[in-house]
């Protein structure tokens, strides 16, 4: 891409004019192929961060980033669903949600990330399970989902490669908190899964990246707009993150908490979020007639062992040995690394 064309885009953003969409497409291709001067990418990111871009431009950016890599295609994506959380302390819903939804009859090709800032990543948590392989390519993801209904895989270079470079540069240019850039980064990868429905869990509070309700609402609206613009049925749930979720914080500890919920017990706040998010996806996909029916389906698979059985299938499919899977379910503390020191802190409130 010619440097003059990038400068044209930057000038249009700075003057709050609509970007030339053809040039924007060329820019995304150049980023994905790594044949653009990094200095120009930095300037473009800073312009977006300072001035913002429209919902339509954000959708075009997201679509271009999605199309920069592999896209999973399904014969019928009506029942293909996923969720994304902006992250928080003790936020481990994906570990239970994917198998529970699969047990309800929908397909969950979940791409997940590693820890960011003070929040733990789903992939880091799964890798605390001995043998669990999160490195699946798009074809492996699709094959596993067709076979057992769900997978949880790490983001990889095949999916939205343009995001890889943009994200790395955002990190060193203090543009991480740009709502259009956050939106494009998240939704481009989710859209590449070939989804029919998506639920966004936008955390708000002291332990969240978006601490004010206004910021959380703005991000939620931006992501919903971009996803719907790409034809994905999408809703956002703004949930509180002033306190940790559940009774465990830490990679292997949150696996313990998740297994407890999959066994039909565990912390009530964790289960409540899993049921809430799962029910919304069941309604969006047409699997449940309304929220009450969706919640009943989710509660049923958590109580009757079907969600736990799907979790075991997922572990086996992704490299965990049969003996270790059985140990993980029955005596997880014998398989997972234990904390070297435990301190109990009693509440002073009644």
Per-segment meaning from a language model:
Residues 1-90, 262, 310-321:
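Acidic, glycine/proline-rich low-complexity segments that act as flexible tails and inter-domain linkers
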Residues 4, 8, 13, 20-21, ...:
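Well-ordered secondary-structure scaffolds
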Residues 45-48, 125, 163-172, 201-210, ...:
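Active-site-proximal beta-alpha loop/turn segments in soluble metabolic enzymes
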Residues 50, 96-107, 189-194, 229-230, ...:
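Alpha-helix C-terminal capping segments
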Residues 79-102, 106-118:
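Glycine/serine-rich anion-binding loops at beta->alpha junctions
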Residues 111, 145, 153-156, 186, ...:
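Short beta-strand segments
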Residues 125-151, 221-227, 231:
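A glycine-rich helix N-cap at a beta->alpha junction
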Residues 146-193:
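Phosphate/diphosphate-binding glycine-rich loops and adjacent basic-rich segments that engage nucleotide
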């Amino acid at each position: 891409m010619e440097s003059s064309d990038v400068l044209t885009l930057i000038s249009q953003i700075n003057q709050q004019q609509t970007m030339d969409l053809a040039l924007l497409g060329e820019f995304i291709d150049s980023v994905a192929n790594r044949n653009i001067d990094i200095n120009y990418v930095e300037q473009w990111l800073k312009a977006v961060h300072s001035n913002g871009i429209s919902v339509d431009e954000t959708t075009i950016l997201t679509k271009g980033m999605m199309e920069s890599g592999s896209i999973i295609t399904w014969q019928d994506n009506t029942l293909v669903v996923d969720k994304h959380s902006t992250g928080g302390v003790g936020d481990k819903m994906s570990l239970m949600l994917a198998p529970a939804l699969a047990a309800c009859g929908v397909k969950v090709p979940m791409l997940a990330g590693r820890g960011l800032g003070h929040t733990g990543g789903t992939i880091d948590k799964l890798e605390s399970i001995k043998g669990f392989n999160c490195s699946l390519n798009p074809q492996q993801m699709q094959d596993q989902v067709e076979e057992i209904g769900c997978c949880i895989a790490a983001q990889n270079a095949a999916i939205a490669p343009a995001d890889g470079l943009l994200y790395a540069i955002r990190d060193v240019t203090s543009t991480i908190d740009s709502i259009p850039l956050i939106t494009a980064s998240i939704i481009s990868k989710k859209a590449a899964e070939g989804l029919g429905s998506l639920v966004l869990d936008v955390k708000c509070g002291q332990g969240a990246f978006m601490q004010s309700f206004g910021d959380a609402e703005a991000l939620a609206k931006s992501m919903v707009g971009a996803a719907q613009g790409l034809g994905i049925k999408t809703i956002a749930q703004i949930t509180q993150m002033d306190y940790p979720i559940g009774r465990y914080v830490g990679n292997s500890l949150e696996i313990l908490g998740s297994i407890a919920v999959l066994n039909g017990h565990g912390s009530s706040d964790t289960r409540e979020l899993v049921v809430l998010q799962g029910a919304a996806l069941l309604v969006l996909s047409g699997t449940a007639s309304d929220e009450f029916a969706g919640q009943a389906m989710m509660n049923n698979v958590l109580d009757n062992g079907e969600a736990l059985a799907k979790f075991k299938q997922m572990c086996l499919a992704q490299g965990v040995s049969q003996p270790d899977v059985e140990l993980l379910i029955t005596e997880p503390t014998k398989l997972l690394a234990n904390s070297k020191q435990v301190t109990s802190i009693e509440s002073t409130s009644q």
